[in-house]
Amino acid sequence: MKVLGSVRGAFAAALLLALVSALPGAARAAQLEVKIDNFTFGPQKLTVKVGDTVTWINEDDIPHTVVSTGHFRSKALDTDDKYAFTFTTAGTFEYFCGLHPHMQGSIVVETATGSAATQ
């Protein structure tokens, strides 16, 4: 009888875990991409949530960097290289290519409630 009770308890715990992880509030952080091509970042402006990771992918034939002064800085990215950054605070993060400063973009990071403070 004791074994049957512990099996039922384990089953109930597994069922509860499955139900909780299926709830909308249990969503995981998103993986988002910005393409670098033809001397542009695309999309040029991206809105994400706190905890999301943005990955920049260089699809251009020449090296580029991703720089947000005081926040993040990639190494020179050759063709097909990637750089990822996880945003842990809300705000607007302006960035540019350190090799080609006319290339600019921004990431707007919102809290779960949708607000973004200026960085």
Located regions from the model:
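Extracytoplasmic copper-binding redox domains, predominantly the cupredoxin/blue-copper superfamily
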Residues: K2-R8, A18, A22-Q119
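Gram-negative bacterial Sec-dependent N-terminal signal peptides
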Residues: A12-A14
